[in-house]
């Protein structure tokens, strides 16, 4: 993964079906690279699957239905979120763009950006079809 002086890091945030990976970040990457910027994609949806394996359905439920209360799952989610933040901080892009593909991505976006803002000082852009419901677009902007 390109990390030296990276302009833009695009992130696919959980949770969306693995059988239909979102194409938005790939299309955006092509456009920003054509415009002369360096860019890479981080697929946190796939990373969640890789980190949870046979327990993936529990985490799918956690992020899509907000079914909380299992201390073990809560602790694992916290560890996973921390690992994602640490990865972004290590990459240290000038801009992080988070693709909120569906409204099922909103909880992961809120949890991730809350932690990310504590350690990452670059620009953060949130966009996608899933931000238009329940006020996530206005709740997490900084203008």
What residue spans do the PLM features occupy?
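Glycine-rich beta-alpha loop elements in corrinoid/cobalamin-binding modules
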Residues: 24, 28-32, 44-46, 73-143
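Nucleotide-activated donor-dependent transferases that construct or modify glycoconjugates
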Residues: 6-17
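Short Asp/Glu-rich motifs
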Residues: 20, 50-53, 136
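A short beta-strand-loop structural module common to alpha/beta enzyme folds
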Residues: 38-49
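Charged, often glycine-rich, active-site loop that binds/positions anionic groups
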Residues: 48-77
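Glycine- and acidic-residue-enriched helix-capping/strand-helix junction motifs
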Residues: 16-25
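A short, charged/proline- and glycine-enriched loop
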Residues: 2-8, 92
